[in-house]
Design a protein with these regions (language model features):
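Short catalytic/binding micro-motifs of nucleotide second-messenger systems
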Residues: 12, 53-58, 90-100
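Conserved long alpha-helical elements within nucleotide-processing catalytic cores of c-di-GMP signaling
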Residues: 1-10, 14-24, 28-52, 62-65, ...
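Short, intrinsically disordered/low-complexity patches at protein termini
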Residues: 38-39, 85-88, 94-96, 104-106
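Sequence-level detector for tyrosine residue identity
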Residues: 12, 34, 69, 80, ...
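A short glycine-enriched loop-to-beta-strand structural element that forms part of the catalytic core
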Residues: 21, 59-74, 97-117
Length: 117
């Protein structure tokens, strides 16, 4: 699924000459030995909900791994990226009241020439 989203995003940037922002949200257990997969899956569903209610209709999200979601922000100005990530983080922590996980994220940009920044 990730490959399809990335290919779509790459074609989009070439065709429309717009930049995309990639945000990779990662769920991190506070205890390195944490192994409750069912609880982790529930928390990932919570993250999915937080992302869905926080994105615009044109933006895309896809599950990247058992602990990660990739968000593709289409033609989002640099100064608004923190607004979106803050909204997702706030939504997540309002819904998730547990103490086993924290949420982190990394941002990359796909330029019009398809290079990553």
């Amino acid at each position: 699924e990730f490959e399809q989203v990335f290919e779509l995003a790459s074609r989009f940037t070439k065709r429309n000459e717009q930049e995309l922002q990639l945000v990779l949200f990662t769920l991190l257990p506070l205890d390195d030995d944490y192994k409750d997969v069912l609880v982790q899956e529930e928390v990932m569903m919570t993250l999915s909900e937080a992302i869905q209610i926080s994105l615009r209709r044109v933006d895309i999200s896809v599950r990247f791994s058992s602990t990660q979601y990739l968000v593709v922000l289409i033609d989002t100005k640099q100064e608004y990226i923190s607004v979106v990530t803050d909204r997702i983080m706030q939504s997540f922590y309002m819904m998730y009241r547990g103490k086993d996980f924290v949420l982190d994220y990394d941002i990359a940009k796909i330029r019009k020439n398809n290079s990553l920044e």
